Amino acid sequence: MEKYIMSLDQGTTSSRCIIFNKKGEVVSVAQKEFTQIYPKAGWVEHDPLEIWGKQAGVAGEALNIARISPEQIAGIGITNQRETTVVWNKRTGMPIYNAIVWQCRRTAGYCDELREKGLDKTIKEKTGLMLDAYFSATKIKWILDNVEGARELAEKGDLLFGNIDTWLIWNMTKGKIHVTDYTNASRTMLFNIHELKWDEELLEILDIPKSMLPEVKPSSCVYGETDEILFGVSIPISGDAGDQQAALFGQTCFNAGMAKNTYGTGCFLLMNTGEKAVDSKNGLLTTIAVGIDGKVEYALEGSIFIGGAVIQWLRDELRMVKTAQETEKYATEVEDNNGVYLVPAFVGIGAPYWDSYARGTILGLTRGAKKEHIIRAALESMAYQTHDVLKAMEEDSGIELKALKVDGGACQNNFLMQFQSDILGVEVDRPEVVETTALGAAYLAGLAVGYWKDRNEISQNWAISRSFAPAMEDEKKEKLIKGWHKAVTKAMDWEDKE
């Protein structure tokens, strides 16, 4: 009887289930979107019960599509939108509030208060993260302080916290297992990434009872088994990692200096730094890449707020293109950018600049500038931003980038990938299987149950669909990068500070 691995990929807008075979190929996919809740400006929530319902639904659907029985699943891997926070009553199993999503800014004011007390340095040293409303810690505190009776229940030991991975595992095991992995724990702003444990001092500062927190385990191990009510049989739950870390693993970035970029709405860059937690001097995050083989490995992470979203903007707001795919055709119809630069700082600019007062700009316009030049400049902006983050990573880690592995929607744009390679001066590799996030979770699950022997076997699965080699002269490259940095300087500090 042929065996498979099931991957549950719980994202920000949809719940998916992908089933993989031994070669790491996709056998079936099922997906359901769920509701985005916006109670106030800047607030974002999800319904945890809806997420669990949809996730269980797509798991059954993926089995049906693949025409395989639950007995053929050797293990289940979970990957999830990181930082999103669920608090529930362990006696009833019911959430006491909606899940507060990573994008939600409601606790920004409280983060400012902590910053005024000088706690940002403590938090960075212990967790590797910047003090920000993005991470789970202040979201948990908000629920405890604002939901009636929450604090009393927490003090009594009746409340549990989890990111989405923890919430799914708890439901899949009918409340038997309250667990997370090192990668997800490292995104809570409560986990000491050097000592590998929940940090007592941070829990005290934020007034969060330790009894709420899940046990932290490796990213690849058997956490427990699914309750039989779910599939009719018990299946080991054996892999767990946050989405970006899962993608790094799925791209087989197993050695220090290997990096991947996910070109989504935003771009997420992670570089493996091995067993060394590199402290960033350039505004990058230090995070746990994976917990496996009795140790943890670390990564540097840089986020680009506006990646593929700049193409959506060209399509929906400026109506320059009908589909994202058309951008490649327009970009190649002109020889160069004609001196035009587009800095997509619509919501400020992220790593390594970190200026929330920057705003979007189009610079270098002359009478000869056409729509094609603006479209080309928009695509190029993704490559320039990626270049800036990777240079910061090289500087912090002291490791020179050899090649960049890519995934996400915009990696299908051949013009962008070639330009990315030219600007970086290294090879850009697009894999055959671009479902790298789900694949990473599947690999972690499969390793724990012996479906794959080791990372060497997995590395052999990784196949290049297309490789892009740098073909631009150094002088031209330096001139373009200089122009980009000049454009970024003009975009910065634009919005008036209140």
UniProtKB/Swiss-Prot annotation:
MF (Gene Ontology): ATP binding; glycerol kinase activity
Activity regulation, short description: Activated by phosphorylation and inhibited by fructose 1,6-bisphosphate (FBP).
Any GO BP: glycerol catabolic process
Superkingdom of the source species: Bacteria
Protein family according to the UniProt entry: Belongs to the FGGY kinase family.
Binding site for ATP: T12, T13, S14, T265, G308, Q312, G409
Quaternary context: Homotetramer and homodimer (in equilibrium).
Catalytic activity annotation: glycerol + ATP = sn-glycerol 3-phosphate + ADP + H(+)
Record keywords: ATP-binding, Glycerol metabolism, Kinase, Nucleotide-binding, Transferase
InterPro entries according to UniProt: ATPase_NBD (IPR043129), Carb_kinase_FGGY (IPR000577), Carb_kinase_FGGY_CS (IPR018483), FGGY_C (IPR018485), FGGY_N (IPR018484), Glycerol_kin (IPR005999)
Binding residues for sn-glycerol 3-phosphate: T12, R82, E83, Y134, D243
Gene: glpK
E.C. no: 2.7.1.30
Role: Key enzyme in the regulation of glycerol uptake and metabolism. Catalyzes the phosphorylation of glycerol to yield sn-glycerol 3-phosphate.
Binding, glycerol: R82, E83, Y134, D243, Q244
Pfam families assigned: FGGY_C, FGGY_N
Species of origin: Clostridium botulinum (strain Kyoto / Type A2)
Cellular component, GO annotation: cytosol
Entry keyword Ubl conjugation: no
UniProt-recorded name of the protein: Glycerol kinase
